[in-house]
Amino acid sequence: MENIFSVKDKVIIVTGATGILGHSFINALAEKGAIVGVLGRNEKVAEQRVKDIIQNGGKAIALIADVTHEEQLAAAKELALNEFGKIDGLVNAAGGNMPEAVIAPDKDIFQLDITALKQVMNLNLFGTILPTQIFGQTIASQGKGSIVNISSMASQRVITKVLGYSMAKSAIDCYTKWFAVELGKRYGDSIRMNAIAPGLFLTDQNRTLLTNGNGTMTERGNLVIKNTPFNRFGQPEELIGALVWLLSDASQFVTGTVVNVDGGFSIFSGV
């Protein structure tokens, strides 16, 4: 019987592949037989991750591009097509926050750093839209494929301090649903877009907000754990099941859906 969860020989582009979650994604997909496009800004890290995948028997290519620069993305797409001849999937994993956009408790909410907020919005929202414009067009023209966006619990629950990030992720949820409808109507039932909304996972961007230098939890970190029924942070590999499902034929009638992978954070009232 055919394995409907298989991603073997699918060419899947992963943006943000030089980050923590992206690293987990590319390794898991390569282990499952996918051909991975490792897209990121840091050439040294991207090349090393490709080297690691190849040494472990997988197939991958480094695609050096900034997700907010259309010309770089177009060049990356051509490189992938020249190497592999097709693109079957896209994972929009690039994103994150920046210190200047974090709103501290003592900061006047009427004196926000608008420039920083715009930068965070640009990275997270348009850093999802632009790769979709470039790679998604190729996927759609081929007649079959899947696009997976990475959202966040910050799109569903009010999480203090991270306004720009929260707004961007909320917009990604809206974009996912809107674009899924248009893809289905214009290109048929074999082109899909969905999103994964992770709960709280430790990343380079949020580590200083959630943990102290000695590894203990900050007050904010403890609040997150308190409001997560599973009583812990998520691990990157715990996103893989949802990711593979959405990229594979196992989810062929699923589109416009935001899948929560959050240890129950989104459903718990705190009581």
Segments (PLM) and residue ranges:
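Short C-terminal tail/terminal secondary-structure segment
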Residues: 2-3, 244, 255-271
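Conserved glycine-rich cofactor-binding loop
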Residues: 11, 18-19, 42
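Conserved glycine-rich Rossmann-like NAD(P)H-binding loop of the short-chain dehydrogenase/reductase
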Residues: 34-49
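Active-site Tyr-X3-Lys motif and surrounding loop/helix of classical short-chain dehydrogenase/reductase
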Residues: 75-82, 101-122
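Catalytic Tyr-X3-Lys loop
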Residues: 110-129, 144, 148, 167, ...
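A short, exposed helix-loop element centered on a Lys and neighboring polar residues
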Residues: 132-133, 177
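Residue(s) in the substrate-gating loop at a strand-loop-helix junction
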Residues: 152
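Short, small/polar-rich loop/turn modules that mediate ligand/substrate recognition or access, typified
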Residues: 187, 192, 254-256
